[in-house]
């Protein structure tokens, strides 16, 4: 009988710290990593590379089904590898972002990418970062964590990130954008942003990232009986 690889899902709103936590857990456990938020950008970039029309659902479905992408976390940095090439920076361009929003609108593309995401489930295990990993993509995952934080704290973290990059930011505007996105995500008809019924809800508002990582790893190891 073939062993089924365990999955740890990390869901939650934007700015809660999911990416940092997932990278740390993948490195600590030496497991595979899936950044579901980057998948649509990677597909959009692949379409641009192969001159596939991003407005054609029929053309995009086979590309989505066989998307050659890997996520590698090294020393806290996430590398996105498309067809053997590091495209971590390239997927963050505005051109790719615009194309990604187009490809994400097609139901058959979303279905193909759902199957592609599930194919990341390989031994020794998978850390899956997203918004509906525990509810839609891996509903049978043995460990589910919903990482949350207050909208004010998430706006504060985002402001610090932008300031470090030299950007001038308005806290009130950031907070309003986060609240608007939260409302949209939590009330959408398909795959709303809600914790799975069997998820550990971990509030990181008053915790350091080190404390969040420690709590998440401790919970996962207990659930999976890992040493």
Curated annotation (Swiss-Prot):
It comes from the Bacteria. It is found in: Cytoplasm. ATP binds at residues 12-20. Belongs to the cytidylate kinase family. Type 1 subfamily. GO terms for molecular function: ATP binding; CMP kinase activity; dCMP kinase activity. One of its GO terms (biological process) is pyrimidine nucleotide metabolic process. One of its GO terms (cellular component) is cytosol. InterPro entries: Cytidylate_kin, Cytidylate_kinase_dom, P-loop_NTPase. This is Cytidylate kinase. Its EC number is 2.7.4.25. It comes from Shigella dysenteriae serotype 1 (strain Sd197). Keywords: ATP-binding, Cytoplasm, Kinase, Nucleotide-binding, Transferase. Disulfide bonds: none annotated. It catalyses: CMP + ATP = CDP + ADP; dCMP + ATP = dCDP + ADP. Gene3D superfamilies: P-loop containing nucleotide triphosphate hydrolases. HAMAP family: Cytidyl_kinase_type1.
